């Protein structure tokens, strides 16, 4: 049931709620909290109400949506009450504020609060600079924001850390619950070795990727690198480096993940991207300060930025390791060749030169012997037979 109350007051809205309770049997005695949603009028308001209705099936509450309308219009309050099937397990009160009233959301909210019930404020889109100092934020026990909706999500997280107050939380943090649980479970399995470093890969505009990297830096106390991914959605992969090998949790498609651990078969896991409904339900379960979230925000400066497009999957890391090994081998070979040349220069002239070093040969031997090519060819054959041993060392 939807009841429209155009050009009304909060007093008339309260009277209408009492009337509906008496005639229709809609009661507010079972409501556990008041959820205040602050957003602009339009499609965004309906999306927020839909998510709140779904969340109310687990947390019956009174939803008061404060929709800010045109500020140049005349001062006016339009209200709408939704109960029954249109409100899930809650009762929804939508307040559309126009003109000067658009900035008086707290004054309109107070008369509609449930008595002796906690208040949760949710800004699904535009967020005040300091939520705890906002007029509605002062009324709330919990203040929910969403850095994902900001123009610069990562910078928004840094601002959240600077103005954090007990009761603040962000849905970018709530989206990490499944990732944190899987990583913690993987570390609980043997071998119980210390993590040496970690790498988190995700899209550049993913605040959850940055928060996950900060959480690992805070919880493990190890260097953590945040790498930007060109493909994928949100968080793509996490690599934990230990002495025995890597723990890799990779989700390339945003739905299913693969957990790889040394000495164990790969495991395919369901790791869907969490909806607003799921995140809101989780946040409404607790009204106390989130200390882990606070510590994670303070650990943001510890995260090292990564190069764009780099990959942290197990295969990618292995290829980089092989490349580094090959490069080191070439460098060692060159160094060995130079040492052999210097040693041969100090030796008698009869000592055979290193294959392919014509300059060294001319310095060591003024008059080359006729059999030099044969000796060099034989040295090359012996070098191949011994799988890459140094020719000069073999002849010496």
Question: What are the residue ranges of the model-derived segments?
Answer:
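An N-terminal, globular interaction/scaffold subdomain
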Residues: 1-121
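Short N-terminal or domain-adjacent regulatory/targeting segments
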Residues: 1-30, 170-188, 285-311
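Extended, compositionally simple fibrous regions characteristic of intermediate-filament-like scaffolds
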Residues: 27-28, 86, 150, 165-176, ...
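A generic structural motif
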Residues: 63-71, 122-124, 147-148, 223-234
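Internal, hydrophobic cores of structured domains that mediate oligomerization or house catalytic pockets
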Residues: 95-184
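ATP/pyrophosphate-binding catalytic subdomain of soluble kinases
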Residues: 172-227, 237
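Long, compositionally biased intrinsically disordered terminal regions
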Residues: 220, 232-234, 243-316, 322
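Intrinsically disordered, polybasic Lys/Arg-rich low-complexity tracts
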Residues: 312-396
């Amino acid at each position: 049931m939807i009841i429209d109350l155009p050009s009304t007051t909060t007093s008339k809205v309260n009277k209408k709620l009492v009337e509906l309770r008496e005639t229709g049997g809609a009661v507010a005695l079972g409501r556990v909290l008041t959820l205040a949603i602050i957003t602009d009028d339009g499609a965004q308001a309906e999306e927020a109400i839909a998510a709140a209705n779904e969340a109310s099936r687990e947390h019956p509450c009174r939803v008061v949506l404060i929709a800010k309308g045109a500020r140049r219009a005349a001062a006016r309050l339009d209200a709408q009450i939704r109960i029954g099937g249109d409100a899930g397990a809650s009762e929804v009160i939508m307040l559309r504020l126009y003109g000067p009233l658009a900035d008086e959301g707290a004054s309109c909210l107070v008369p509609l609060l449930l008595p002796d019930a906690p208040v949760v404020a949710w800004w699904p889109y535009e967020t005040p600079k300091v939520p705890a100092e906002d007029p509605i934020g002062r009324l709330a026990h919990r203040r929910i924001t969403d850095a994902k909706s900001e123009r610069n999500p990562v910078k928004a997280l840094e601002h959240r850390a600077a103005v954090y107050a007990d009761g603040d939380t962000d849905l970018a943090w709530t989206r990490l619950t499944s990732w944190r649980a899987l990583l913690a479970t993987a570390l609980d399995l043997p071998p119980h070795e210390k993590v040496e470093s970690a790498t988190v890969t995700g899209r550049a505009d993913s605040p959850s990727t940055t928060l996950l990297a900060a959480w690992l830096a805070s919880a493990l106390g190890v260097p953590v690198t945040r790498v930007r991914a060109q493909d994928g959605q949100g968080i793509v992969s996490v690599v934990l480096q230990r002495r025995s090998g890597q723990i890799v949790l990779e989700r390339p498609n945003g739905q299913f993940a693969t957990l790889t651990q040394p000495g164990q078969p790969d495991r395919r896991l369901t790791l869907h991207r969490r909806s607003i409904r799921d995140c809101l339900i989780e946040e409404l379960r607790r009204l106390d300060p989130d200390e882990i979230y606070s510590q994670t925000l303070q650990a943001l400066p510890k995260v090292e930025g990564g190069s764009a497009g780099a990959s942290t999957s197990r295969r990618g890391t292995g290829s980089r390791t092989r490349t580094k090994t090959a490069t080191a081998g070439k460098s060692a070979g060159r160094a060995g060749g130079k040492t052999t040349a210097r040693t041969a220069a100090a030796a008698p002239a009869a000592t055979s030169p290193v294959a392919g070093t014509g300059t060294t040969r001319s310095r060591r031997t003024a008059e080359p012997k006729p059999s030099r090519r044969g000796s060099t060819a034989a040295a090359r054959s012996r070098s191949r037979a011994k799988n890459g041993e140094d020719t000069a060392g073999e002849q010496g």
